[in-house]
């Protein structure tokens, strides 16, 4: 219970004071003169020049007023001076009107410790639970406040923005990997065919790589290698002919489609023009003596892969800007990055250490597709720089390693002919050799019989020669029949090709940046709460007593307030701030619909 002086002068019983002793709200002043003028302007219900207060023993201080109770019904506040305190003004709440008799009413009161000692206390650094803070930075971006409020925000989001980002817009790459070189070199005939071509492709490796840029409609970009136009074949021709070429059939290890091959290429989407480094790539014509030429690109070497950056624009773009900046934070707003292939990550937009959301793309030419998408400067501390920031972004990455394979047809006849080519040639040679030897042997025998004048011997020898030749023909026919039987076996898919047709046919390429926001009803509910009570900050600091135009809410824990006042009143003031109180800077107390911008 606050200390009450024994007496008072210039006692004024007031009406229309819009706050009470629950200390949920109070009027905050910048000077004692402003404070006096504000209270003195309120309606005076009754005045007394000098009063001795009563009820101290019962801890129920009151003033005996010579007025009927019903004439005091609107009395809510008292102000008075005390000579013993240098004529200081004291302020008090009317707590009860007690009927004494027809002409006398006891007006019970208790000291308003906050108004009475407002200019006698000093805030020290204290633990601030919540208060009104600065909402927006000077550049219009929200200030960061992510402390959990423990409030219900629902279980569903509205999707407010969907953007698809691809490394090279509509262009993609068919990657063909072979065990050996499938093309010749201009001026060198076919001297390189079937050569093993060990090279640098991120690391030393023995396989050969061909790339073929194309679009969904089957067309190819105008491609230059150095200053030379590569005149690439349409993608359908490429696929049709590559399995017809003797240098390609069963030489192919894998084929897949990818959005990014690990290099920042000079590509102009508007002109559909691609420029490649002649030291890394060369035009390749794959052909044989029976089929037309297929023009594609052979990868000579790739010493190092490069990171491609996609600037998606303002990281806050797409979100509905709310009056309360905290509603732009996670979990009220979420940025999701997904490829719709089972790979996704949820981002806290505020932790992107940049005003723009930039996607870093990493890729390679491996035996299968692998492309990584990471967010630049996500959770990157201010102490990181350069390559460290780039590396740190890998901690939050979406890695698309879906095979994206193209079906490979295995022709049993081609496989048999090529895989057993030497064996077949040996069999043919053996058949012919045995037939000739047999015929020669028969001829020698016939000659001997002729010398010996044995007509029967001559006849048998001729028969033997005929039989030997016939056996050779039969053996050749059997071998050809075996080959014909194999040719009648239907071609089979040795690799089905995964979901490439579904993913690319439906346009699921690159990554999608999806922005989600709370349902409108929850945004309204939380916005009104934050507007009234500010944000949790859980920090040790001096409170913001007057940073807003209309009001400041402050709640502390074990706050530290000093002042040249009695300890009982000081402790009560500390309790008021620990419980939370709204300090009003305007006379429109209780009207939370007013604009409450920063001063």
From Swiss-Prot:
The question of whether tRNA processing is a record keyword is answered with no
Q: In terms of domain of life, where is this protein from?
A: Viruses
* GO cellular component: a single term: virus tail, tube
Where in the cell does this protein reside? Virion
InterPro entries, sorted: Gp9_C, Gp9_N
Tell me where it mainly resides. virion
A Pfam family annotated for this chain is: phi29_gp9_C
Query: What is the protein's known function?
Result: Distal (knob) tail protein that plugs the end of the tube before DNA ejection and forms a channel perforating the host membrane during ejection.
Its recorded name reads Tail knob protein gp9
Q: List the gene name.
A: 9
